[in-house]
């Protein structure tokens, strides 16, 4: 029975392939970018087997060029792998590539894509991005969370200090730090279901970052059920939804009674969104689901990506002891004799900033960015990009291109000393947070959760590898997923540092 079902599916897919080929026969004059050979039904999918997507696509681009076409099942896709082509997509023709493709996971976990990251381009997206930039993640709001960051960093330092007799799972502790930091910023306090919630969010992000064959055959709705992915995502999402719904309703109740929700007395992120909901006057009134979608974006961008950046920074410094010593010396000289310091003081640490810049060059949080979708037929470099084409920018490859970076694969923070390259998408060879209209709106929030903990950990502890390990033994293997996190947990031994009081 199962055999006949598979045969039926194959025949049906074959029919769709022939039908699509017939429909597209009148557009053969369109000159698509070059790309690898294609098979019926699967298109270019076989070329993606056997490696991490951003690695495979970089290697294919070496053969087919910086603007490359792939046929992924039913989906037409273009991959950008040079600063010039990235500028065409993210600046010159930004409006034409400002939308997002429809994918299963964001449709579910982002409440029909009513978030910011996966929302299709239009008036609703413009409204919510404006709210995010001016209210939710404004510089003022990010600064208002400084006491929460200070408290969470203190917890992290105290945990490491209590574990100095054995190796610390650096990866695990930093994920818990960024998760707790985001929880308290969003919800105002540590809540009773926080640990369960953090694990559920981690599960949902993992599922959302997985490959689902139904996304490359969007016309075949039954594949979502057949692969089982929809059920897995729905199950985890319902649990997350119930927890956040309770938190929102508790906030509404407290506000109605004149109580503050944040343990520190200020507005948390839900308070901000509820205030805007109650004020009215918006073209698209905010609902509970809209709030939950924005909160999911916050956790997706503020936990996995920040903790991954911290881990990669430490991995690279442990592999390069001279760089570790230089970063540590800077922190300890700047705060000599102090027991602690806050994030305003971290502004003085110029070399630490270079370390983070170099970390993001080699390990951008989302190596292919969130994919864009072509809204109107566009010509780039003499090639036609059809409407609905999925566009991926390989920022991992851009950051390692030897045409633009000397000794591109090696970790050298000093390369940025005399370099004006920044994070905000103006330099197309360096786009760790994207560029154009869809650049990540949470850059300030994310970096604030990276600088302070890293500076504190370098200040308070001397670090070494577990017995028997050498710096060269630290591998750089990445996980498969939306984020390029390190595959193996980083285990380190910490020795408390006693600052001189002279």
Swiss-Prot record:
Q: Which domain of life is it from?
A: Eukaryota
Cofactor(s) required, per the database record:
heme
- Where does the record say this protein resides? Membrane
Q: Write down the membrane topology.
A: Single-pass membrane protein
Q: What keywords are annotated for this sequence in UniProt? A: Heme, Iron, Membrane, Metal-binding, Monooxygenase, Oxidoreductase, Transmembrane, Transmembrane helix
Known role: Involved in the biosynthesis of solavetivone, a potent antifungal phytoalexin. Catalyzes the successive and independent hydroxylations of premnaspirodiene and solavetivol. The first hydroxylation step is 3-fold more efficient than the second hydroxylation reaction.
Q: Which family does it belong to?
A: Belongs to the cytochrome P450 family.
- Listed name of the protein: Premnaspirodiene oxygenase
Q: So where does this one cross the membrane?
A: 2-22
Q: Entry's Pfam families? A: p450
Q: What class of enzyme is it?
A: oxidoreductase
* Enzyme Commission no: 1.14.14.151
Coarse class of the protein's main subcellular location: membrane
Task: Give me the reactions it catalyses.
Answer: (-)-vetispiradiene + 2 reduced [NADPH--hemoprotein reductase] + 2 O2 = solavetivone + 2 oxidized [NADPH--hemoprotein reductase] + 3 H2O + 2 H(+)
